[in-house]
Amino acid sequence: METGARIKYHRIKQQLELSDLAADLLLPAELKKIELGEITPSPEVLKALCEKLKIPLNPIENPIGQELIEQFKEMLLHPQERIRIREHYYFILQHPLLNIDEEVELEYSIQLIRFFVITGDLDGAGEKIQELEKFKEFMNQEQYYLFHKYCGNHNYMIKNFDEALNLYLLAEKIAPSSVLPTECGDLYYSIAISAAQLHKNEVADKYSRMALAIYEEEFVPKRIVECHINLGITQQRLKNFKASLDHLKIALKIGKKLNINNLLYISEFNCSIFYYAHRDFNSSIHHMENCLNYIPDEYIADKLAAYCLLVKCCFEKQDYIGLQKWMKTGNNLVIDNNIDLNSPTNQKFSEAYYEFRCLQNLYEENYTAFEKDALKSLIPVLETDKNFHDLAYYYGHLGNVYLKLGKFKKSAIMLSEAQEALKKFNSFH
């Protein structure tokens, strides 16, 4: 970092105005020119400024600090062992070599955005982004690229998918040529999943293939599986059903070879969703039952979502034995974990719990409770998530319930809403 930039960096860091730092030394206008690199300060002025800022006169070479950050960055690129990542974070947290030079300190701050996102501290990530906004001018090209990419990560996690995609595409434009292939792959994959969330299927397909090519070359199995799953989803939306199933089967095959529970979980889950959408309920049940073997006990929302799909399959098959089995299993999960309306802490949890309540009321023919839960709890969540397939499903059930109760006008309205949701689903896919 150049002399003027160093002075400005520490002035901003210490929240000093130009006039505060310049006081008794030189004019604020002269200090501004020094910071901009337009004039070189005399040795006496430079020494006085550095003493006032309490920084060394010259930048410090810090190879050990740089190595600590490189290790941290590598762990964060494809995080698998979050315990090791946390251990490394706590190891370097108070390390004196992270704050003795500006380059390492800035790099560390940027990597903290990624760390907070990975560990689920989204508020911490947001605060770090806000803090770093005023230091963007001091970033080198790679740091500037990573800052925008990690801002994209944060926006993706808070479900601001439009902004996430825009940030990722900007990061692609400003990425330095020295970026490693795996880093490029991670960016392409991030673009793909953001585009998929926005149903920009051609973009999602393009970048999934670009990421897959890199991950196959570099052999990153976890991401190979995830790319095939994303391609399976986008190909289904593009009406290429055979290609969609082929990608999902490849993902499942690789997952079985690697025997990694998380990969098997997402592969089996997406295969089940595919077959459910195509009304092959036996195959859907088979894959979802397999999926349950790989969901950790603490992933309550995921288990509840799996039970919901199994219940819906049994409803469609009119398999009342299976229906009773999965309703009982789901209800035991709710009771054992003391889940109630105040429990959901995020949209995924909310959707799973509200859906299970609706299915339970439907199963027990408690139509008043079903109507209340569907209209007040589940449908608003589905609308927020733009889950048109399930909106059509539950509007349809509401229509049938109103028909049974002789509420013909309400029935017609709900069945019309179901048709509208189905149209939106088909136009999105």
Which residue stretches match the model-derived regions?
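A short, Lys/Arg-rich alpha-helix, primarily the initiator
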Residues: 1-13
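Structural motif corresponding to the intra-repeat A-B loop/turn of tetratricopeptide repeats
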Residues: 14, 79, 119, 158, ...
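Short alpha-helical DNA-recognition segment
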Residues: 14-33
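Amphipathic alpha-helical segments of tetratricopeptide repeats
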Residues: 89-97, 129-137, 169-179, 209-220, ...
